[in-house]
Regions:
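N-terminal basic/disordered segments at the start of proteins
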Residues: 1-26, 36
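Short acidic, S/G/P-rich loop/turn micro-motifs used as interaction or catalytic elements
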Residues: 11, 34-39, 62-68, 95-102, ...
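Histidine-anchored nucleotide/phosphate-binding helix
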Residues: 16-21, 40-53
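Conserved, mostly hydrophobic/aromatic
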Residues: 30
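A broadly used, surface-exposed interaction patch
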Residues: 48-111
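Extended alpha-solenoid helical-repeat scaffolds
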Residues: 83-84, 114-130, 134, 145-148
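Long, charge-rich C-terminal accessory regions
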Residues: 130-271
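Hydrophobic, glycine-enriched assembly/anchoring segments
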Residues: 259-305
Length: 305
């Protein structure tokens, strides 16, 4: 099963909301981390997912965005108090490291919760971790001997090769082989990633000197690897203006590739939205561009598994 990990921001939630009615519930389970105090969009998304037989994992002790400086106490109760989200999600507890006893102790109050490990954990916590419904971890940050002793593991990675500037993207980058390699361990039941957004939390994007469109794909001739094509604008790249013109330039490059290689990308909801945008040369805004890329990424992986 695929576990896309997203922040509870507008476009990430829109992505999950729109995909809920078209993706098979048996293929994916989103992991959502609240990052602001606006709960209505999150609640609506939980409800939409549940209506389509998906129970997302929702981090109930978030630590990013609004919650980097504000307490998340009461978040679970707030979501349970609303009939649109009550009992429609799985609480997920974020554990920073082996010293995070506060987070580990939460599991006693939420016995069916999942655990999300940000880094390494000690052998002394194994019994606690194995009482969780599942444990999400990054194999590059957790001792393999610990991983092997856990019962129900979901491995995730921060796979998107994010650049500081859009101008620094090459035409293609390797993403991950986790969609295949996760099956090698018998105690691993799924894999996850941060789509094309990356693990780092950013409140908003910077000025658009260059507009980039990121399109994920699994090549049928090399299905063990996922890659990402990056279509970048070059016009007015010294000025943070003309985002619409820059987007259209990148979009033309994208569809020139598609015309020459019509079977490389899956026909997804996200790709159909890019196609509709291309048909009328409409710039929907940079947030929606990322949204379309996220939709395409998630659906492509669901199609594969």
């Amino acid at each position: 099963m695929y576990y896309p990990i997203l922040k509870a921001k507008r476009h990430e939630l829109n992505t999950l909301y729109d995909l809920a009615s078209i993706l098979p519930a048996t293929k994916y389970r989103p992991v959502i981390e609240p990052v602001n105090a606006k709960y209505k969009p999150l609640i609506a998304t939980i409800d939409q997912l549940h209506n389509n037989s998906v129970s997302p994992l929702v981090i109930i002790n978030p630590s990013q965005g609004h919650f980097a400086k504000n307490s998340s106490a009461g978040l679970f109760g707030l979501l349970q108090a609303d009939p649109k989200s009550a009992n429609k999600f799985v609480p997920c507890i974020k554990v920073k490291d082996a010293a995070d006893s506060t987070a580990l102790s939460l599991l006693a109050s939420y016995p069916n919760a999942a655990i999300y490990l940000e880094s390494d954990i000690g052998a002394g916590s194994l019994s606690v971790l194995n009482s969780a419904s599942c444990v999400l971890l990054n194999q590059q940050k957790v001792d393999e001997s610990i991983v092997d002793k856990l019962h129900n593991v979901v491995v995730y990675s921060d796979s998107f090769a994010k650049k500081k500037r859009n101008a620094d993207y090459t035409s293609k980058s390797f993403y991950s082989g986790l969609h295949v390699s996760y099956k090698k361990k018998s105690n691993v039941s799924g894999f996850g990633d941060f789509t094309i957004m990356g693990e780092e939390y950013l409140d908003s994007g910077g000025p658009a000197f260059v507009v980039a469109i990121h399109v994920s794909y699994i090549d049928a001739t090399a299905p063990n690897s996922m890659h990402v094509h990056h279509y970048c604008s070059t016009v007015d790249d010294k000025l943070p203006t003309n985002s619409g013109g820059k987007y259209k330039e990148a979009l033309v490059k994208m569809f020139a590739f598609i015309a020459a290689n019509p079977t490389v990308y899956d026909n997804t909801l996200g790709l159909s939205e890019f196609r509709a945008s291309y048909a009328i040369m409409h710039f929907p805004g940079l947030g929606l561009v990322k949204e379309m890329s996220m939709k395409h990424h998630i659906e492509s992986l669901c199609n594969y598994i």
